[in-house]
Amino acid sequence: MAGSREVVAMDCEMVGLGPHRESGLARCSLVNVHGAVLYDKFIRPEGEITDYRTRVSGVTPQHMVGATPFAVARLEILQLLKGKLVVGHDLKHDFQALKEDMSGYTIYDTSTDRLLWREAKLDHCRRVSLRVLSERLLHKSIQNSLLGHSSVEDARATMELYQISQRIRARRGLPRLAVSD
């Protein structure tokens, strides 16, 4: 689409740090509009990992062997996000894990797109999970591995949902997202 900003989908997986198990970034994946992986690394967070959250995060102690240090990964990721429309689900958590203020970015968040929720017949809900949106609109079952979530799979799902939202907007004559300012 000519005159449009480049779009990238992001998903992060977190582990618990310290005695209070505060979230720390342990994996980040970025995909382009076609679902091709632009970035996918395990990241060594700052602080002591006290809970790998493996059932959800998919991260194990073995993944931390040779993992990219947080400070290095953060710079790599932010460089890839710069100037792009960032797509994701509940992105505030991903940006918090990156220790980055998301107000400086243009974002599209599937967790707040009521138009998408209506299309999935979920507009009565207070919150909608990525898993449910994917089942309803993509007819795909995600996040069902016993090994935890895949941030690549989740990023691809949010990108596909973004594309559905764009088609709904076009069909209804609503402004499309990602148009350059």
Curated annotation (Swiss-Prot):
Tissue distribution of the protein: Highly expressed in peripheral blood leukocytes, spleen, thymus, colon and lung. Up regulated by E2 in estrogen receptor-positive breast cancer lines.
pH-activity relationship: Optimum pH is 7.0.
Recorded GO MF terms: 3'-5'-RNA exonuclease activity; exonuclease activity; exoribonuclease II activity; metal ion binding; single-stranded DNA 3'-5' DNA exonuclease activity; U1 snRNA binding; U2 snRNA binding; U3 snoRNA binding
Chief location bin: nucleus
Cofactor note: Binds 2 manganese ions per subunit.
Keyword vocabulary terms for this entry: Antiviral defense, Cytoplasm, Exonuclease, Hydrolase, Immunity, Innate immunity, Manganese, Metal-binding, Nuclease, Nucleus, RNA-binding, rRNA processing
Its EC number(s): 3.1.13.1
GO cellular component: Cajal body; cytoplasm; nucleolus; nucleoplasm; nucleus; P-body; PML body
Known catalytic reactions: Exonucleolytic cleavage in the 3'- to 5'-direction to yield nucleoside 5'-phosphates
Subcellular location: Nucleus; Nucleus, Nucleolus; Cytoplasm; Nucleus, Cajal body
Pfam families assigned: RNase_T
Binding of Mn(2+) 2, residues: 90, 93
Cofactor(s), names only, from the UniProt record: Mn(2+)
Induction summary: Induced by interferons alpha and beta. Weaker induction was seen with interferon gamma. Increased expression was seen at the transcriptional level.
Function text: Interferon-induced antiviral exoribonuclease that acts mainly on single-stranded RNA. Exhibits antiviral activity against RNA viruses including hepatitis C virus (HCV), hepatitis A virus (HAV) and yellow fever virus (YFV). Inhibition of several viruses such as chikungunya virus (CHIKV) does not involve the degradation of viral RNAs, but rather the inhibition of translation of viral proteins. Exerts a translational control over a large panel of non-self RNA substrates while sparing endogenous transcripts.
Quaternary structure and interacting proteins, as annotated: Associates with PML and SP100 in the PML NB complex. Associates with survival motor neuron protein (SMN)-containing macromolecular nuclear complexes and U1 and U2 snRNAs and U3 snoRNA.
Family: Belongs to the exonuclease superfamily.
PANTHER family, A to Z: INTERFERON-STIMULATED GENE 20 KDA PROTEIN (PTHR12801:SF59), RNA EXONUCLEASE REXO1 / RECO3 FAMILY MEMBER-RELATED (PTHR12801)
Protein name: Interferon-stimulated gene 20 kDa protein
Lineage: Eukaryota, Metazoa, Chordata, Craniata, Vertebrata
